[in-house]
């Protein structure tokens, strides 16, 4: 049962993290009459701007997180980011709190070690070789065992922060220092992974719902500096490789438990599929589904977490997204060129309304459909390039 916002019977959902993905989740929640409470570490975050009300707290502060949940008494807590005091969610879930998809899933995927050990050691899924390291000595030993090229990531980081590829051992010291600076909790543990010379990488959006496991068409994407620049759907792949990908995604999602949409990242090399990472929430590469599907990844996530069935997911054809990425410093961000950006057929634009920029930041995404993937990607890139950001 869903009530009406601001009434005694309202169904209340609390978003922990109010970025651009949380904003789209909030919109879908409101379309189904859910009262939305936004929580983030800074004011006027994108989802806060449309939530029924919002709070600013340090979500890594266990006491502050517990206090705001006890104050609002939400029926659902929806983590949108990793930087959260997840042990508090585990404790409160045991007390009856409904965490989406589960507190365990949120905790396991908060750091790369938990989810990698689940996938490789518990589920026996194919992954790249890896070592976890606490010291620079262990780090150098791991590189010696794995060899170069290899990939280095802080176990707790996002959006490519602290991530680098070592192509020569002379780069080791610099990579260690960069990883120590890029972790969410400051310096600390890192993962060293063997580099898989993959043919392509995909995000397989996988939904666990009351009526079973469902998949969106595979999404291809291009990464740069550890963050996505373009994504497209569908990624061309053989039926055999798709079946292998879906089998891996199903195992991971079922092991994590709960209802919701999961972004499962996979590497494909020939007919082999390797597990990379998983997010127990909508994925940034899945922004393409805002134009490529009748139900976006956000609509699917909300249906699933509300206990509603997932119908057949219709994919509209070759579609792409391209980010509007800007570097600068301002608290007065304005946009020009929108008419040019939207002049072509089957193009859309999402400006995230982030309140400020200090360095490099993703401020929007251009979306496009066309006759084939290459044309759709080029159209999205052209649209994004016409958005002029004024500081």
UniProtKB/Swiss-Prot annotation:
Protein family per UniProt: Belongs to the PurK/PurT family.
Keywords in alphabetical order: ATP-binding, Ligase, Magnesium, Metal-binding, Nucleotide-binding, Purine biosynthesis
Enzyme Commission code: 6.3.1.21
MF GO annotations: ATP binding; magnesium ion binding; phosphoribosylglycinamide formyltransferase 2 activity; phosphoribosylglycinamide formyltransferase activity
Reactions catalysed, as given in the entry: N(1)-(5-phospho-beta-D-ribosyl)glycinamide + formate + ATP = N(2)-formyl-N(1)-(5-phospho-beta-D-ribosyl)glycinamide + ADP + phosphate + H(+)
Pfam family, one: RS_preATP-grasp-like
Quaternary structure (record): Homodimer.
Location of the ATP-grasp domain: 117-306
Biological role: Involved in the de novo purine biosynthesis. Catalyzes the transfer of formate to 5-phospho-ribosyl-glycinamide (GAR), producing 5-phospho-ribosyl-N-formylglycinamide (FGAR). Formate is provided by PurU via hydrolysis of 10-formyl-tetrahydrofolate.
GO biological process terms, semicolon-separated: 'de novo' IMP biosynthetic process
GO cellular component: cytosol
Binding site for Mg(2+): 265, 277
Pathway: Purine metabolism; IMP biosynthesis via de novo pathway; N(2)-formyl-N(1)-(5-phospho-D-ribosyl)glycinamide from N(1)-(5-phospho-D-ribosyl)glycinamide (formate route): step 1/1
Residues binding ATP: 112, 153, 158-163, 193-196, 201
Name the UniProt record assigns to this protein: Formate-dependent phosphoribosylglycinamide formyltransferase
Amino-acid positions noted as binding N(1)-(5-phospho-beta-D-ribosyl)glycinamide in the UniProt annotation, renumbered to this chain: 20-21, 80, 284, 354, 361-362
């Amino acid at each position: 049962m869903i009530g009406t916002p601001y009434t005694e019977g309202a169904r209340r959902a609390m978003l922990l993290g109010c970025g651009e993905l949380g904003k789209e989740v909030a919109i879908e929640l409101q379309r189904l009459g859910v009262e939305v409470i936004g929580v983030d570490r800074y004011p006027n975050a994108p989802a806060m701007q449309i939530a029924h009300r919002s709070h600013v707290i340090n979500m890594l502060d266990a006491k502050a997180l517990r206090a705001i949940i006890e104050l609002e008494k939400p029926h659902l807590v929806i983590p949108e980011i990793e930087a959260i005091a997840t042990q508090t969610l585990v404790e409160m879930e045991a007390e009856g709190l409904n965490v989406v998809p589960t507190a365990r899933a949120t905790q396991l995927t908060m750091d790369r070690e938990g989810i990698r050990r689940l996938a490789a050691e518990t589920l026996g899924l194919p992954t790249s070789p890896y070592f976890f390291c606490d010291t620079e000595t262990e780090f150098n030993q791991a590189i010696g065992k794995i060899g170069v090229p290899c990939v280095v990531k802080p176990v707790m980081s996002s959006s490519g922060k602290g991530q680098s590829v070592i192509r020569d051992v002379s780069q080791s010291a610099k990579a260690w220092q960069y990883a120590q600076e890029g972790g969410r909790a400051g310096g600390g543990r890192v993962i060293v992974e063997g580099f898989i010379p993959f043919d392509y990488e995909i995000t397989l959006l996988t939904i666990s719902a009351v009526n079973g496991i469902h998949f969106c068409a595979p999404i291809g994407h291009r990464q740069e500096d550890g963050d996505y620049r373009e994504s497209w759907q569908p990624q061309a792949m053989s039926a055999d490789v798709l079946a292998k990908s879906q089998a891996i995604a199903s195992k991971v999602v079922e092991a994590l438990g709960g209802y919701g949409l999961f972004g499962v990242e996979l590497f494909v090399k020939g007919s082999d599929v390797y597990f990379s990472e998983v997010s127990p929430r909508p994925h940034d590469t899945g922004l393409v589904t805002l134009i490529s599907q009748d139900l976006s990844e956000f609509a699917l996530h909300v249906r699933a977490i509300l206990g509603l069935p997932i119908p057949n997911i219709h994919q509209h054809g070759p579609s792409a997204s391209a980010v509007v990425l800007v570097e600068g410093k301002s608290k007065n961000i304005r946009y020009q060129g929108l008419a040019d950006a939207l002049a072509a057929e089957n193009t859309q634009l999402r400006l995230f309304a982030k309140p400020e920029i200090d360095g490099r930041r993703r401020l929007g995404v251009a979306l496009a459909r066309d006759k084939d993937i290459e044309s759709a990607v080029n159209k999205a890139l052209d649209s994004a390039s016409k958005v002029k950001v004024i500081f």
